[in-house]
Amino acid sequence: MCIRDPISGIGGMNHFLLPGRGPGGERSGRYGDVAVPLLVARLLALGAARNDLRAKVFGGGHVLSTVPAGGRTLGADNVQMAMSALRDEGVRLVSEDVGGTRGRKLAFNTVDGTALVWRL
């Protein structure tokens, strides 16, 4: 996920592995329910304005050869968490490249807000 305030030019990105930490879980950026609010808080602390924040979401691909019982994949759960967390934080989504069966490599230019994606 890339988030940037185009007015101030302040931006950053995160990558989380799991959607949520569960009851009593450690507060770590590897979880989406922690990583997204942490990134937004850091951008605001650096001078970004919440109303100006724009997000781009990438990933959520199902890169394993098996589908879990019930058909829900970790990638789909991560995408759902990302979208939900952005709504909760009041951050507008401007683009997404999610799902599929391949991983992604991402480069984010915080100066102009461009994001380059390579499918692996």
Q: Which ranges hold each PLM region?
A:
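Short histidine-centered catalytic/ligand-binding loop motif
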Residues: 20-29
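Phosphate/ribose-phosphate-bearing ligand recognition and processing surfaces
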Residues: 62-76
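Electropositive, glycine- and tryptophan-enriched low-complexity nucleic-acid-binding patches
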Residues: 9-13
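Divalent-metal-activated hydrolytic enzyme cores
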Residues: 75-120
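Short glycine-rich phosphate-binding loop at a beta-alpha junction
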Residues: 51-59
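Conserved small/polar residues in nucleotide/adenosyl-binding loops
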Residues: 1-5
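Short, well-ordered amphipathic alpha-helical segments that serve as non-catalytic structural scaffolds
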Residues: 30-46
